[in-house]
């Protein structure tokens, strides 16, 4: 698989993809890096950390691959990931739903945004597609707890996404085309 190969991963461990948004997210990056030794016992980690947020001390690890930003090949990284930790922007979470990727969503707080990510995350949580962690309550320890809870229950989230008509864009488009042909 291209994503695994691009990261130098063997495919023997589950893969966690961490995305902090287009500019990264310092608090998310810091928490993830603090618990990295514990997480990498179980997971290989792809970390999209944002421009200027690479940690040079972590560059040559075989179980952790960091990128400032990815445009070419992002689809391969999504394909390689078993689950995702991310902000809750509408484009990203729509991708997670379409690809059936269980996610831990950490929306921007109301102080830092219009509140749309909070609503997006709440909707996904209510539908059983994701777990949500409030950034104001997030510590490295709560992030670790939530990541492992997501991992241990990932099938539950996949089943919920598979049952959702919102997750099957092709079927929705075909239904519309057939309706127009009548």
List the predicted regions and their residue ranges:
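Short, hydrophobic alpha-helical segments
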Residues: 147-155, 177-182
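Short histidine/acidic/glycine/proline-rich micro-motifs that form metal-
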Residues: 22-24, 108-112, 163-164
